[in-house]
């Protein structure tokens, strides 16, 4: 490799100081500008990094002992604190040849006491001599010819640098005067110019450094040497710190590059995403095929093994059962009629795995069901919720984290949409009971009379208050009150009754049932039903005659629910209200007559339905009593009944933090919130496609066929409802699925995302739930597509939902996928669509499955790693996993489809980065949005901020963190003390991404900073006199020392006691309501960080009018007093 010229070396050195780990593109551009190849530049950077930096590398080369002046000059040249310093050194180098003068070193006692470093060279050792071919410095004897050749080039370069430097100094002058100069430049300039503190730092430093040789005789030699030695030590520490930061940035850049490369694998096209047009064409094509189980029974009958009814016996004397002869085989519900005679499907040859091998997922199928219900909702409505993409394993892992950024952002989006739905329903003025759940209706009734609460919820929602707002919203919906639960049960009776008979709101049959049920035994005429608003909304027909014909045919088609009591009047049969269907009397052959009376029918107690007398006056009296009883119940239910908190997770939110909840309790919170959102107008009015071929169709019974339907429903159970579409989790258990329900996926959002493609160019598609189809047993197959890259489990797994008990399994290898395709029959309606969906994605899935298997085999050792101890650098924000759970999950993790790297270095590094992002999110969405912070009246230095390494709070003018020993700024008056501390106390920072010190809670630290900001924003007349004179200083110290919720509550209580209420009366624009609530509710509010944050937001809103109008203060006596007292305590 050819020798590089001095100019090339100098340019490489300058680029190296700016960026130690350049990208290949940057190295290529640098090589082109210098006339070097990429290989030469890369090799030079490798050798330069291996040699090391700073004093240590110079000592090893033998230059520091030979010429101390060269040592000092090299340090100044390598410093990156200022461009002006580098220019001054360059100008000093081109001055004529001077005789080298040796510098007198500091005495040994000074070195041993203040400068000695443990990692420095051994005292008394001699340095190696320079090799014979080493290149010497120009002023130590280089030829005059070489000097003359370099002078012109150096002069030209220095002149260009001087022009750029002067322009930069002029542009940065205003910023420097406002915020001060950097810590490295400030320290060097003040050390070299102790008597000049009121001049322009940028220009004067350049002039002083350029004329340093001429003015060197003015200062005593010993003082000058001491200042240089001190400046070199300070610059050395700054170089070490900046090099560490550059390493971290380079590691982060490499991670981003790897992430981009991973995303490019699926960037061009994702064949797994849902396609709405293909979905419609497929439904039209397969609608003509025969039902899958009817096809299966025909084949069994042809093979001589026909299915027989389980209750049919040859000894009964009957020569043939119409069910066994195939009359009922024309129904697609044959699997429900003969559940014990049909073989298992899919067979055992299709090997499936459990989704997760981690506790509690591997031992609690119910938790897995709830998890996939939540996942399905989030993936399906990701565009509506406006949440960023995430993978299934990231979401599952977030439940184990103590403070999860992902769960916080998702809850924030869900709450924003829920409040928007509540506001939309309140603006309409009337609550339609068409598709609103009982809990959502209770929430609307609670907020209807208190509009200010809704405004407060919407304006106060942020990253720290969402937990308390979630608790208040769920309590208002009736989850925390016993009487609200009774009310919800009363409101849900009609819904339960409809679900028992397979009716659905929004359909003609369901609305007719609701209207006739409300009229009791009197019923309604067909003309009255046709003119009802509930029927008009369905848009059946424009002509009244056609509407009446549709209603008449619907009522006459099911004689088990409706009976005709006159020529054009229908009512609901009384025996359909029986609690136990088996106890109801069976119909005789003539029970379908329209003249049948209800006297012969057995009825249940009045809890199900109240039979109203035929006397109209008595009926009106009872209706008034019922309405009065309901109105009183609503008033009572608006209060929070803390004696009956209801669900355990609600009590946990009231008495503790969200992070203290268990995994199951966090899931219950999600499910409750999703049940409320499912009834909102945003989700309810989505135009969702219907998978007609995959749903059990309604049994349209005419005439005596109604008896078959009722008798079969009494003997056999309907298939269970899917967790991912329909039914409330709380209050409605074990309900049968509506016969005309349909699976919901993301097919409808494909067009909506195409409109937003310009704003979301980083992802090929949004998060999606893709419904692939169902098999002959109504088992469903799903894809959950998260972030479109190779690390997403949804892009390489097919998720199986059982129709028997609702458990979930995963197909994650191509052998199982092809085995499933081999057992499916494309002649059936449902399996034909499933085959088409799987074959379309087969090659893509198999390739992703195969590549993942190779990756797992290479990194299999990660799954066997267990934490060596329970403590970690992030123990306060670590996950909730314990050693026993991890050890017990070792075996199950190997057989699970999705494996978590518990205890690995990569997992710890990812956890630390998530903690830092969570901390930034808390401060950005809570602290920085406070009016007291945005309109700060006090000095910038008189405010609290946090250390990004350990989250500890410090004042703006502090220099050093006492917990993690991070350096914020170099103190002007204590440079020597800082140098001693840097050499003896400060630990050497490694390039690891997780520290070994204690990490403090981000919530508590942000609360303390917010309290101090609000207290500082209030004027002197807003607080009692004794507070400003003596109590404030002690209160600030107590605030910084507080480390728990109880301690910070006591500190805030002292502050509340010092507030002048009269000032708040005149300050607030919102009057007595908000002011009284803030002052009076503080002692009784829950002792949680979220509740305290909500109280602070209310107080900040109350004083916002004054803070926005008040001018900033010029003098800060409190700041000066605080700084003086703190520095005196340091000494």
Curated annotation (Swiss-Prot):
Q: Which stretches are tagged as biased composition: Basic residues?
A: 239-251
Q: Where is the DDT domain?
A: 365-424
Compartments (UniProt record): Nucleus
One Gene Ontology biological process = flower development
Q: Which InterPro entries does the entry mention? A: Asxl_HARE-HTH, DDT_dom, HD, Homeodomain-like_sf, RLT1-3, WHIM1_dom, WHIM2_dom
Name of a matching Pfam family: HARE-HTH
Which regions are flagged for Acidic residues bias? 587-600
| Keyword Manganese recorded | no
Q: Which SMART domains match?
A: DDT (SM00571), HOX (SM00389)
Q: Which GO terms describe its molecular function?
A: DNA-binding transcription factor activity, RNA polymerase II-specific; RNA polymerase II cis-regulatory region sequence-specific DNA binding
Would you tell me the Gene Ontology cellular component terms? nucleus; transcription regulator complex
Q: Where is this region: Disordered?
A: 239-264, 579-609
Listed PANTHER family = HOMEOBOX-DDT DOMAIN PROTEIN RLT2, HOMEOBOX-DDT DOMAIN PROTEIN RLT3 ISOFORM X1
Task: Name the chain's protein.
Answer: Homeobox-DDT domain protein RLT3
Gene name linked to the record: RLT3
């Amino acid at each position: 490799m050819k020798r590089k010229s001095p100019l090339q070396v100098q340019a490489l050195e300058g680029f190296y100081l700016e960026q130690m780990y350049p990208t290949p593109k940057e190295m290529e551009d640098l090589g082109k500008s210098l006339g070097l190849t990429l290989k030469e530049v890369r090799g030079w950077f490798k050798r330069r990094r291996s040699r090391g930096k700073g004093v240590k590398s110079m000592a090893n080369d033998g230059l520091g002992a030979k010429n101390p002046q060269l040592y000092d000059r090299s340090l100044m040249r390598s410093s990156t604190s200022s461009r002006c310093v580098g220019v001054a050194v360059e100008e000093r180098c081109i001055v004529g040849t001077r005789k080298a003068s040796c510098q007198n070193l500091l005495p040994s006692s000074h070195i041993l006491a203040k400068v000695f470093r443990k990692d420095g060279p051994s005292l008394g050792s001699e340095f190696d001599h320079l090799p014979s071919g080493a290149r010497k410095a120009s002023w130590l004897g280089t030829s005059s010819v070489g000097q003359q050749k370099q002078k012109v080039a150096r002069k030209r370069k220095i002149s260009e640098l001087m022009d750029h430097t002067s322009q930069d100094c002029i542009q940065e002058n205003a910023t420097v005067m406002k915020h001060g100069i950097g810590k490295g430049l400030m320290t060097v300039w003040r050390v070299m110019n102790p008597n000049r503190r009121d001049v322009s730092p940028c220009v004067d430093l350049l002039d002083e450094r350029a004329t340093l040789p001429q003015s060197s005789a003015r200062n005593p030699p010993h003082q000058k040497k001491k200042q240089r030695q001190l400046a070199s030590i300070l610059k050395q520490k700054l170089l070490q710190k900046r090099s560490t930061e550059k390493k971290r940035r380079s590691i982060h850049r490499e991670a981003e590059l790897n992430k981009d490369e991973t995303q490019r694998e699926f960037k061009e096209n994702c064949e797994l995403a849902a396609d709405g047009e293909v979905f419609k064409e497929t439904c039209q094509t397969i609608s003509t095929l025969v039902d899958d189980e009817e096809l299966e029974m025909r084949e069994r009958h042809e093979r001589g093994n026909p299915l027989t009814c389980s209750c049919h016996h040859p000894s009964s004397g009957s020569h043939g059962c119409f069910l066994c002869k195939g009359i009922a085989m024309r129904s697609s519900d044959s699997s429900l009629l003969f559940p014990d005679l049909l073989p298992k499907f899919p067979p055992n040859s299709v090997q499936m795995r459990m989704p997760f091998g981690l506790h509690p997922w591997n031992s609690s199928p119910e938790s897995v069901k709830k998890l996939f219900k939540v996942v399905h909702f989030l993936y399906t409505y990701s565009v509506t919720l406006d949440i960023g993409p995430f993978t299934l394993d990231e979401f599952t892992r977030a439940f184990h984290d103590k403070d999860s950024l992902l769960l916080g952002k998702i809850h924030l989006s869900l709450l924003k949409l829920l409040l928007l739905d509540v506001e939309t329903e309140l603006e309409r003025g009337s609550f339609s009971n068409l598709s609103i759940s009982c809990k959502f209706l209770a929430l609307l009734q609670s907020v209807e009379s208190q509009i200010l609460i809704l405004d407060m919820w919407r304006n106060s929602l942020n990253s720290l208050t969402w937990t308390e707002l979630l608790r208040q919203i769920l309590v208002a919906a009736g989850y925390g009150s016993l009487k609200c639960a009774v009310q919800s049960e009363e409101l849900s009776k009609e819904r339960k009754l409809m679900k028992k008979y397979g009716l659905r709101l929004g359909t003609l049959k369901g609305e007719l049932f609701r209207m006739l049920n409300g009229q009791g035994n009197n019923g309604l005429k067909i003309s009255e039903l046709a003119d009802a608003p509930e029927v008009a909304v369905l848009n059946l027909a424009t002509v009244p005659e056609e509407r009446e014909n549709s209603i008449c045919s619907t009522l006459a088609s099911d004689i088990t629910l409706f009976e005709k009591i006159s020529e054009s009047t229908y009512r609901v049969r009384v025996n359909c209200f029986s609690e136990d269907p088996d106890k109801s009397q069976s119909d005789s052959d003539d029970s379908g007559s329209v003249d049948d009376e209800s006297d012969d029918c057995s009825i249940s107690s009045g809890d199900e339905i109240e039979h109203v007398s035929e006397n109209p006056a008595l009926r009106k009296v009872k209706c008034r009593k019922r309405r009065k009883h309901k109105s009183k119940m609503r008033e009572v239910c608006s209060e929070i009944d803390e004696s009956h908190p209801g669900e355990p997770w609600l009590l946990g939110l009231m008495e503790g933090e969200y992070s203290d909840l268990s995994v199951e309790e966090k899931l219950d919170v999600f499910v409750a919130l999703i049940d409320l959102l499912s009834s909102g107008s945003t989700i309810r009015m989505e135009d969702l496609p219907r998978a007609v071929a995959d749903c059990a169709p309604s049994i349209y019974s005419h005439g005596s066929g109604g008896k078959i339907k009722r008798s079969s429903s009494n003997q056999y159970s309907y298939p269970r409802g899917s967790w991912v579409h329909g039914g409330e989790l709380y209050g409605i258990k074990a309900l049968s699925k509506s016969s005309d329900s349909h699976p919901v996926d993301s097919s409808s959002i494909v067009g909506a995302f195409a409109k937003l493609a310009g704003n979301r160019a980083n992802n090929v598609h949004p998060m999606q739930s893709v419904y692939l189809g169902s098999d002959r047993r109504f088992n469903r197959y799903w894809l959950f597509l998260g972030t479109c890259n190779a690390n997403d489990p949804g892009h390489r797994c097919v998720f199986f939902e059982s129709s028997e008990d609702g458990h979930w399994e995963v197909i994650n290898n191509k052998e199982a996928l092809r085995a499933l395709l081999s057992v499916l029959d494309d002649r059936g309606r449902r399996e034909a669509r499933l085959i088409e969906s799987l074959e379309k994605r087969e090659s893509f899935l198999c390739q992703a499955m195969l590549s993942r298997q190779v990756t797992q085999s290479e990194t299999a050792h990660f799954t066997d790693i267990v934490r060596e101890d329970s403590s970690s650098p992030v123990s306060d924000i670590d996950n909730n996993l314990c050693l026993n759970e991890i050890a017990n999950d070792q075996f199950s993790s190997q057989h699970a489809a999705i494996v978590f790297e518990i205890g690995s270095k990569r997992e710890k590094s990812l956890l630390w980065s998530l903690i830092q992002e969570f901390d930034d999110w808390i401060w950005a969405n809570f602290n920085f949005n406070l009016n007291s912070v945005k309109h700060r009246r006090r000095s910038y230095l008189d405010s609290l901020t946090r250390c990004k390494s350990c989250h500890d709070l410090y004042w703006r003018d502090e220099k050093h963190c006492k917990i993690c020993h991070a350096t914020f700024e170099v103190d002007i008056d204590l440079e020597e003390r800082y140098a001693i501390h840097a050499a003896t106390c400060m630990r050497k920072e490694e390039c690891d991404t997780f520290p070994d010190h204690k990490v403090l809670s981000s919530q508590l630290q942000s609360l303390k900073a917010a309290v101090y900001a609000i207290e500082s924003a209030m004027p002197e007349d807003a607080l009692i006199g004794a507070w400003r004179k003596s109590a404030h200083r002690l209160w600030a110290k107590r605030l910084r020392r507080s480390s728990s919720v109880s301690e910070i509550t006591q500190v805030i209580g002292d502050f509340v006691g010092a507030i002048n209420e009269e000032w708040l009366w005149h300050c607030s624009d919102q009057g007595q309501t908000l002011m009284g609530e803030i002052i009076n509710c503080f002692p009784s509010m829950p002792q949680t960080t979220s509740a305290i944050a909500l109280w602070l937001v209310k107080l900040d809103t109350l004083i916002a009018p004054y803070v926005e109008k008040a001018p900033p203060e010029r003098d800060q006596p409190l700041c000066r007093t605080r700084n003086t007292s703190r520095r005196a305590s340091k000494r």
